[in-house]
Amino acid sequence: MKKQLDQLTAYTPGLSPESLKKQYGIKGELHKLASNENVYGPSPKVKTAIQSHLDELYYYPESGSPKLREAISQQLNVDASRILFGAGLDEVILMISRAVLSPGDKIITSESTFGQYYHNAIVESADVIQVPLKDGGFDLDGMLQQIDNKTSLIWLCNPNNPTGTYFSHDELFNFLKRVPSDIPVLIDEAYVEFVTADDFPDTLKLQEDFDNAFLLRTFSKAYGLAGLRVGYVIASEDAIEKWNIIRPPFNVTRISEYAAIAALEDQEYLKEVTQKNSFERDKFYQIPQSQHFLPSQANFVFVKTSRSQALYDALLNVGCITRLFPNGVRITIGLPEQNNKMIEVLKHFEY
């Protein structure tokens, strides 16, 4: 057994509504707003696509998801040979880490970001440098100072999970200019569809100038397919060719591929979802207590408090399950009535 596994624990999902009801003695309805899921669900066309292909379940998937790859290639205007799929971004991160990292290599990322960058690096016996956040966001200058000849991967998350903060196009451009061209920079844009900031990076455009800038996206968030597990990376052809060696041959299911294609094609529904999210997100920042909230470009709000357990409990008491952190609570943007209840709690909470 790998000794480095002693440094890790298995992922612990949040308690189910049923478990929390029993633990806290809650009798009313509980809403799961802890995992940044799209509360509006996927496009209705997804259900139609799934139902129309149920008679294919006894077939293996087409390896590499060629239909979906071509659909994304057409929509984003990138060569299909530069796209690789995983069963969610979790698997994409695992494949890249496994393909690139050797014992003694180093990755650079941030504190308080998506945990799978750290987790998979430790599994591969790599060292992890976690640069503290600056004003709730990635400290890109601080990360540059950590680069040395052992650095093999740099992981960025934009907007960042769990804080919702982002760095701009110019900030990313200036960062990439200063990173040695042989070090891959992985830019995780899982929440990009929710972004409304005008200066958010056009990462696809930046890839034209920086061969080491690799982009990760997912169907789990805005597209509402978290239960079907489809994520992908857009990178250089050489990198994709190598990483594809690591990919399990049938990792994305046949049904997942059809569902993702249907979701991708319904851009009008996606626009409706993201507009609703933006409207509801803004409501949180219209109250005076928003001084305690980190500015978010995602479908969640991070609330800073030294009394995070008390805030978690207060939100639970109005029927909303959120995500507890030592320094705050992350609230997934819910339906209007759920958000209104949480905002009332936030208005009267002593931070």
UniProtKB/Swiss-Prot annotation:
Pathway: Amino-acid biosynthesis; L-histidine biosynthesis; L-histidine from 5-phospho-alpha-D-ribose 1-diphosphate: step 7/9. GO terms for biological process: L-histidine biosynthetic process. It is an enzyme of class 2 (transferase). It comes from the Bacteria. It catalyses: L-histidinol phosphate + 2-oxoglutarate = 3-(imidazol-4-yl)-2-oxopropyl phosphate + L-glutamate. GO terms for molecular function: histidinol-phosphate transaminase activity; pyridoxal phosphate binding. InterPro entries: Aminotrans_II_pyridoxalP_BS, Aminotransferase_I/II_large, HisP_aminotrans, HistidinolP_aminotransfase, PyrdxlP-dep_Trfase, PyrdxlP-dep_Trfase_major, PyrdxlP-dep_Trfase_small. Its EC number is 2.6.1.9. Pfam families: Aminotran_1_2 (PF00155). The modification N6-(pyridoxal phosphate)lysine is found at K221. Coiled coil: none annotated. Keywords: Amino-acid biosynthesis, Aminotransferase, Histidine biosynthesis, Pyridoxal phosphate, Transferase. Its cofactor is pyridoxal 5'-phosphate. Belongs to the class-II pyridoxal-phosphate-dependent aminotransferase family. Histidinol-phosphate aminotransferase subfamily. Homodimer. This is Histidinol-phosphate aminotransferase. It comes from Staphylococcus epidermidis (strain ATCC 35984 / DSM 28319 / BCRC 17069 / CCUG 31568 / BM 3577 / RP62A).
